[in-house]
């Protein structure tokens, strides 16, 4: 999805890594290219529709899923996926090809990418400050109303419309709750990751503003988890009061 590849692009830029992203409409060429990289000892990031992956216990269509391919044999591909999905996992080559080539929302044409070390040096402390500053600027000054604090505010009203027009409240809200907490987000819709990143950044830089930021994100992460828990309750009860509570929490988050 946009977040995943965007995060990878930012990491590559701030740490002077070389990021190569490629797509091809040819299923055979897509595999040949990745196979060559694996044969040369390169781990390859793949964009996949997790519906086809055999290690998913509850398969569903989501074409913005990413995993790292590190080996293969005549029958299977060996990947590293989220802890939720088992960490080191395998799926058949046929299922992998289907997952890479699936069409629909958020899909790509067999997208794959690699990260490589370059000769360019970087200063970790400078990179940390740059990354946090850029993230804050993007959040405060979103180019459209669907992202940043404006996107969260908009979501607070959109979920009410969603509830009222949904034809399958149980499945839709249960799936959303699962995506927010367990689908490679680290929990709390990525906020746990950013909370921990701010803590590690403070440990390195010892800046009071980073300590304050970390403390703020401890609370923000808990609020996001509350939203996902309310979505779960909505799926179980179909009670509008839980949507209203989630909407109120999203308004609070958007103002933080």
Each language-model region and where it sits:
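Cysteine-nucleophile protease catalytic domains, especially the papain-like/related folds used
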Residues: 1-27
């Amino acid at each position: 999805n946009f977040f995943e590849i965007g995060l990878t692009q930012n990491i590559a830029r701030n740490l002077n890594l070389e990021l190569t992203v490629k797509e091809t409409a040819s299923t055979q060429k897509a595999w040949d290219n990745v196979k060559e990289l694996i044969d040369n000892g390169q781990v390859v990031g793949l964009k996949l529709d997790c519906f086809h992956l055999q290690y998913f216990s509850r398969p569903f269509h989501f074409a913005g899923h990413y995993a790292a391919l590190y080996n293969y044999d005549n029958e299977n591909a060996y990947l590293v996926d989220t802890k939720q999905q088992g960490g080191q996992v395998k799926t058949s080559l046929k299922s992998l090809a289907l997952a890479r080539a699936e069409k629909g929302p958020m899909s790509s044409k067999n997208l794959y990418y690699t990260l490589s070390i370059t000769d360019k040096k970087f200063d970790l402390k400078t990179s940390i400050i740059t990354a946090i500053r850029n993230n804050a600027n993007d959040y405060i000054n979103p180019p459209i109303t669907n992202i940043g604090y404006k996107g969260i505010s908009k979501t607070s009203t959109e979920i009410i419309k969603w509830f009222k027009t949904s034809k399958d409240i149980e499945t839709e809200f249960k799936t959303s709750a699962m995506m927010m907490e367990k689908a490679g987000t680290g929990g709390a819709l990525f906020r746990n990751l950013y909370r921990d990143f701010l803590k590690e950044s403070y440990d390195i830089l010892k800046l009071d503003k980073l300590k304050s930021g970390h403390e703020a994100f401890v609370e923000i992460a808990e609020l996001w988890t509350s939203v996902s828990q309310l979505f779960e309750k909505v799926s179980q009860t179909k009670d509008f009061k839980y949507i209203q509570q989630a909407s109120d929490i999203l308004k609070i988050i958007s103002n933080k």
